[in-house]
Amino acid sequence: MFKVDLNSDLGESFGAYKMGMDEEILKFVSSVNVACGFHAGDPCVMDKTLNLAKQNGVCIGAHPSYPDLLGFGRRNMQISFEEAKNYALYQLGALFGFAKAKDMKIQHFKAHGALYNMAAIDENLALALCEAVASFDENIIFLGLSNSAMNEAAKKKGLKYANEVFADRAYNDDGTLVSRKLEGALIHDENLAIKRVIKMIKESKVTSINGKEIDLKADSICVHGDNVKALEFVKKIKENLEKEQIQICALENFI
């Protein structure tokens, strides 16, 4: 039987500002990526998010970012190896404090936004993130884009790696994600997106935006639940995976 993790970004509210439908999405995913304060989230939000994850039996991961609250972590920054490593360690430590207080463990590490996209193509940046994770806890799974520089960096640092794919995003011919700024970057046809997900899991292939068949591995599918329509889409994905006899379970069960 095929196994796959369903992950979603959570805990991205901040102060008086609410973002996402965290309580609802937790019913359908097996792992969540928790914002650690640099692009979103704050101490009270982190506390609430971990409480919700624990109540629903969902595994947690750190979701660190460039220090960019105003830009929601989606703007690139030129930072050194040491800065990248220390930013990651700082945010891991923040999440660990809450996790330890609740007798929970950090299952995985997944970079956010621009940090994720840059680490997918910049091995030096990816190595900095992997070094941070390895020095913090070598048992934490590094979750990153399938067939990217992050995969190679994780191997070099001796970390377990989980290949992530996206249900609603288009791919370039080289396996990177099409920029959100470009037309066609987001796939709005739910049935098409679900067919693509099943193909990625069962055949380890996806068709790029230019029609090229590319190889990738799907250990975890990133889904979003930040509005009612997105939440309904997640329900459909889960239902269709179960129909295809694909088992949904957290990364720690098979990576």
UniProtKB/Swiss-Prot annotation:
Keyword Metal-binding on entry: no
Catalytic activity: 5-oxo-L-proline + ATP + 2 H2O = L-glutamate + ADP + phosphate + H(+)
One annotated GO molecular function: ATP binding
Keywords (A to Z) from UniProt: ATP-binding, Hydrolase, Nucleotide-binding
Alphabetical GO biological process terms: carbohydrate metabolic process
Known EC number: 3.5.2.9
Residues in the signal sequence: none
Family: Belongs to the LamB/PxpA family.
Assembly notes: Forms a complex composed of PxpA, PxpB and PxpC.
Function description: Catalyzes the cleavage of 5-oxoproline to form L-glutamate coupled to the hydrolysis of ATP to ADP and inorganic phosphate.
HAMAP family: PxpA (MF_00691)
Protein name per Swiss-Prot or TrEMBL: 5-oxoprolinase subunit A
Organism (species): Campylobacter jejuni subsp. doylei (strain ATCC BAA-1458 / RM4099 / 269.97)
